[in-house]
Amino acid sequence: VPPIWLMQQAGRYLPEYRALRAEKGGFLDLVYDSEAAAEVTLQPIRRFNFDGSILFSDILVVPYAMGQKLWFETGEGPRLSPLMDKTKLADLKSDETRLTAIYDTVRKVRAALPDETTFLGFAGSPWTIATYMVNGRGSRDQSETRRFAYADEKKFGKLIDAITDITIDYLCGQIE
């Protein structure tokens, strides 16, 4: 039988999450505080005894690890620093130290979870990450990203390859 878990099972519907977020500040303050992120990951397991637990993090830790500035606008969601020169997108390099807190969270959750509880890591798809990196925010139609992809397939392909490489490393880091 596959484990039962819910997308976004940790989060704002839980009063204990809201209290911890108020204490810590913003969303990214929770994500990059391994103690707090582990606590948020474990909250729904304690409350509902789900079969599976999903890592509390965000897909945008990947572009952050690639050097883009990341922040959240209240009421509007995530933002990434604009990439003015798309020719340099594929030159972004991974800084694994920007993922250390996430890996610490994984270790803390693994140590605290009951043996019978499945633990799921995750990462965003390269296309989804690319849309945020190019647009600097979420986009309903991804028009800016599609324009870039069609206008310069080679450069866009390099961007996708760079995102794919760090995503593979990131997922392997979650497993290790």
What are these regions, as identified by a protein language model?
Residues 1-65:
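N-terminal basic, low-complexity leaders that serve as flexible interaction/assembly modules and, when applicable
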Residues 12, 68, 125:
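Gly/Ser/Thr-rich helix-start
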Residues 46, 175-176:
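Non-catalytic positions within long, well-ordered alpha-helices that form the structural scaffold/packing
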Residues 64-67, 109:
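Pocket-flanking alpha-helical
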Residues 71-173:
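Active-site-proximal, glycine-rich beta->alpha crossover segments in alpha/beta enzymes
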